[in-house]
Amino acid sequence: MEPSKLFTISDNATFAPGPVINVADKKTFRTCFRILVLSVQAVTLILVIVNLGELVRMINDQGLSNQLSSITDKIRESANMIASAVGVMNQVIHGVTVSLPLQIEGNQNQLLSTLATICTSKKQVSNCSTNIPLVNDLRFINGINKFIIEDYATHDFSIGHPLNMPSFIPTATSPNGCTRIPSFSLGKTHWCYTHNVINANCKDHTSSNQYVSMGILVQTASGYPMFKTLKIQYLSDGLNRKSCSIATVPDGCAMYCYISTQLETDDYAGSSPPTQKLTLLFYNDTVTERTISPSGLEGNWATLVPGVGSGIYFENKLIFPAYGGVLPNSTLGVKSAREFFRPVNPYNPCSGPQQDLDQRALRSYFPSYFSNRRVQSAFLVCAWNQILVTNCELVVPSNNQTLMGAEGRVLLINNRLLYYQRSTSWWPYELLYEISFTFTNSGQSSVNMSWIPIYSFTRPGSGNCSGENVCPTACVSGVYLDPWPLTPYSHQSGINRNFYFTGALLNSSTTRVNPTLYVSALNNLKVLAPYGTQGLFASYTTTTCFQDTGDASVYCVYIMELASNIVGEFQILPVLTRLTIT
């Protein structure tokens, strides 16, 4: 780079042009500059101090002081108002979410108790339309359809000996008689029960009658509950009702059945679903029965069958379990053609290529036994305020969330909906789902299913679908064994192992024998209590638990189909036990 024409560098460290300044002069200049800077800083500091003093004087001035005091008072007043408003809001929130629901429930229980007290009768004078009100004993009202255990802690259980009480379920009265397919529903005010009375052994496609009863829970002198029957209806009108499901409704019972006089396999092979019947039986002896054709039935289903297990009355709607065969080229059949659900037991998985297992799981929905129809679960939903005009619809869950359709039960516990599905296909374990409905005023309602992973025991099955099989395959097997949840299920990690339920299982992997009462967690059985002798033949079981809130005792009624060597092939027996929880 070319040197600058304005500056040249000399050996004596001076710069040109301009006068030459020696080192001593430079030091003097630096000293003067520093003194000047310090002086400016000192003057600035003095000015700041003076201004602060003036500000203090102004603050101490009476006028400004009064203004500041007024502002402070207003701020304090506003703060007090805000605190008061927040307090009121907290009281409102607590009242709406805690106090009011408890008060309403208490008032409801008191009202039911008062009705039970004043609704009495004498021989000549009665102040009620019936002799005994349709109201459970007050000790049980608030312990029905509630989770017995609210926490997620670890508990131990013991099942007491069966309590001696009169059976509310009649048996067959001849060696050739047959009573089968019990369905039981316990509501807050009363209970409903039904079973099929088959006239020719247990061939339910021939001729049968339907037994229906309703009653209340009362306390015996021994201190434990008894199922007191108040009304009985025996439907003997020539209609062969099958697979009936029962539900408690206000002032009575609702029952969903289908009518058929042919084999179940023939129903699936057909193209038009059998007649669907909805029967309403009230405490004043009124019986109303209607043929229903729920939306979504015609053109989609070859057959539709009630789920046998009980339904529920929920949010002014009547909900029953159902299942059946879907026509392959129907709208529903095309929509669900590729849907399947393949649960896996992580403690005992099925080996093989995943794609192959998925294909086998899909094929399991189309068993050849049912003419290769897709066997699908569903829910019959009827608006209660339009029940006399039977405004019902079929709500169909996705097969990506459920296994092959089968018998089932809808449960309502602590305002939470659960669905039991019989393990009729290849999956051998108990099938229980949490469910939630989305109802619409117009258009199709929907339901979401959330599977609860249970691996504690298996049901008996035949052929390739025994209790030991865990791999997908097409079959129709298993048996109806519904459970009763004792605790709410939580999806939160780490606490699901303390989900408990009880029921009656059949302790065999291949044969319907050895009825056994149990309490179970998700992955292991906690208690086993065999009923009867080893090898006793049995079939369907349904379980309901409730609590005596007077002394906190927990009772469960296990209704079981047991073999009978005296009257008929089966005797339906309600086994009442006390469940101890520690």
From Swiss-Prot:
Protein name: Hemagglutinin-neuraminidase
Biological function: Attaches the virus to alpha-2,3-linked sialic acid-containing cell receptors and thereby initiating infection. Binding of HN protein to the receptor induces a conformational change that allows the F protein to trigger virion/cell membranes fusion. Binds to the glycan motifs sialyl Lewis (SLe) and GM2 ganglioside (GM2-glycan). Neuraminidase activity ensures the efficient spread of the virus by dissociating the mature virions from the neuraminic acid containing glycoproteins.
Pfam families per the UniProt record, alphabetical: HN
Membrane-topology descriptor: Single-pass type II membrane protein
UniProt record, GO biological process: symbiont entry into host cell; virion attachment to host cell
Species name: Mumps virus genotype N (strain L-Zagreb vaccine)
Enzyme class of the recorded protein, top EC level: hydrolase
Residues marked Binding to the glycan motifs of the host receptor (site): 180, 242, 264, 323, 369, 407, 422, 512, 540
Lineage of producing organism: Viruses, Riboviria, Orthornavirae, Negarnaviricota, Haploviricotina
Gene that specifies this protein: HN
This protein's domain notes: The C-terminus (head domain) is involved in binding the cellular receptor.
